[in-house]
């Protein structure tokens, strides 16, 4: 029996590992921007395949672990958090000159309306690494379910949609990605550093977690403000900005839902219930 073309497309996994490694290890000098963007365009189906596999593995593992003791995974978790913290710090540092240089030299509006050299050279290399990293960050959830930590809708929804958006948007190179990527690098630099310290059993003041969540909310407020102004420019002026309507619509959907979910998380965690913790074990009575 012949399969539906869409089903066949989703089952036909094609990931050019050699090509991926060549771009990832190319380095910033003479970075092949066009080839980097084409890689994501050619492999967009991988994000849908990965999302389906991710859901099956995550919720399958959660079910499998329901009557079992949690894994500690101390050393792997320490290594994982350290890698993501170091990567995020490096990305934030490397992209800072281009971000603020564009604002200073071109103006605030132009910095999210136009691409300029955002995907060129060293900055382009780190943009590409950022987009690629969203596939690998799915592993974050595996640690949660194996250690029987709370798995919120916000967590897995955020991971899936960010990955899909990253791989879809980069080939089209919208100017406003400058803000989303740079701000995300900065926030993750703090967030994964915090996770690393906690996984190392290093005492961290309780207000730090609340501050990081607040920083995430500020990130999405800025992103939504940028998109709102671009929407105004697109509909009420003759501004010619560098983005496709489809990417803009997806970005609006993504950032507005993120803002709503993170505000709700903040209220539930720090205002109404007194705090949640990624590293707090699930009470045994909830494991049955």
Curated annotation (Swiss-Prot):
It catalyses: (6Z,9Z,12Z)-octadecatrienoyl-CoA + malonyl-CoA + H(+) = (8Z,11Z,14Z)-3-oxoeicosatrienoyl-CoA + CO2 + CoA; (6Z,9Z,12Z,15Z)-octadecatetraenoyl-CoA + malonyl-CoA + H(+) = (8Z,11Z,14Z,17Z)-3-oxoicosatetraenoyl-CoA + CO2 + CoA; (9Z)-hexadecenoyl-CoA + malonyl-CoA + H(+) = 3-oxo-(11Z)-octadecenoyl-CoA + CO2 + CoA. Its main location: membrane. Signal peptide: none annotated. Belongs to the ELO family. The lineage of its organism: Eukaryota, Metazoa, Ecdysozoa, Nematoda, Chromadorea. The keyword Transferase applies. Pfam families: ELO (PF01151). The chain crosses the membrane at residues 39-59, 73-93, 126-146, 150-170, 180-197, 217-237, 247-267. One of its GO terms (biological process) is unsaturated fatty acid biosynthetic process. Keywords: Fatty acid biosynthesis, Fatty acid metabolism, Lipid biosynthesis, Lipid metabolism, Membrane, Transferase, Transmembrane, Transmembrane helix. It is an enzyme of class 2 (transferase). It is found in: Membrane. This is Long chain fatty acid elongase 1. Its EC number is 2.3.1.-. One of its GO terms (cellular component) is endoplasmic reticulum membrane. Catalyzes the first and rate-limiting reaction of the four reactions that constitute the long-chain fatty acids elongation cycle. Uses malonyl-CoA to add 2 carbons per cycle to the chain of long-chain fatty acids. Condensing enzyme that catalyzes the elongation of monounsaturated (MUFA) and polyunsaturated (PUFA) fatty acids that are involved in multiple biological processes as precursors of membrane lipids and lipid mediators. It is a multi-pass membrane protein. It comes from the Eukaryota.
């Amino acid at each position: 029996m012949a399969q539906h073309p869409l089903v066949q497309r989703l089952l036909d996994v094609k990931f050019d590992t050699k090509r991926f490694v060549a771009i990832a290890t190319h380095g910033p000098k003479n970075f092949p921007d066009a080839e980097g963007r084409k890689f994501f365009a050619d492999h967009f189906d991988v994000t849908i395949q990965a999302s389906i596999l991710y859901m099956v593995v995550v919720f399958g593992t959660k079910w499998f672990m329901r009557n079992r003791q949690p894994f500690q995974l101390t050393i792997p978790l320490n290594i994982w958090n350290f890698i993501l913290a170091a990567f995020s710090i490096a990305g934030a540092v490397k992209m800072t000159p281009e971000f603020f240089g564009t604002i200073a030299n071109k103006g605030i509006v132009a910095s999210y309306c136009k691409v300029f050299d955002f995907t060129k050279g060293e900055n382009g290399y780190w943009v590409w690494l950022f987009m690629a990293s969203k596939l690998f960050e799915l592993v974050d959830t595996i640690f949660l379910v194996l250690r029987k930590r709370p798995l919120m809708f916000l967590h897995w929804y955020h991971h899936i949609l960010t990955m899909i958006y990253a791989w879809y948007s980069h080939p089209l190179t919208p100017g406003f990605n400058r803000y989303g990527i740079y701000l995300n690098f900065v926030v993750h630099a703090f967030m994964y550093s915090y996770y690393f310290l906690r996984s190392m059993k290093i005492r961290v003041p309780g207000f730090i977690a609340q501050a990081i969540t607040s920083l995430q909310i500020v990130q999405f407020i800025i992103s939504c403000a940028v998109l709102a102004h671009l929407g105004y420019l697109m509909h009420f002026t003759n501004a010619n900005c560098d983005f496709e309507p489809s990417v803009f619509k997806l970005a609006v959907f993504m950032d507005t839902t993120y803002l709503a979910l993170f505000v709700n998380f903040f209220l539930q965690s720090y205002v109404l219930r007194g705090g949640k913790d990624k590293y707090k074990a699930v009470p045994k009575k909830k494991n049955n």
